[in-house]
Amino acid sequence: MFGQRQSMIVYLHSLKHAKILRKYGNIHYISKRLKYAVVYCDMEQIEHMMQKLNKLPFVKKVEQSYRPFLKTEFENSRPDRAKEYDYS
């Protein structure tokens, strides 16, 4: 039902135009202080959306999130010592 999603970080000159980003995907977060927005869209459309967003006059730059491509299971990591003890 749902496809794979990926986020883009869109840096803006002004937050006045942040509502326009709704056309390009789901807005997850907007930082007022650092002037960026996190926008989610389908993985198949990520390159196309990045090109469209870069053409907008109020956008400084667009970066792709690499989180879906990172390995989240770590090898040789030591377990936490506090969790080793049974407190029952």
UniProtKB/Swiss-Prot annotation:
Coarsely, its chief localization is cytoplasm
GO CC field:
cytoplasm
Q: What Pfam families does the entry give?
A: DUF2129
**Matches recorded under InterPro entries:** DUF2129
Q: Which UniProt keywords apply?
A: Cytoplasm
Entry's localization field: Cytoplasm
Q: Which domain of life is it from?
A: Bacteria
- HAMAP family (UniProt xref): UPF0298 (MF_01126)
The UniProt similarity line reads: Belongs to the UPF0298 family.
Could you identify this protein by its name?
UPF0298 protein BcerKBAB4_3759
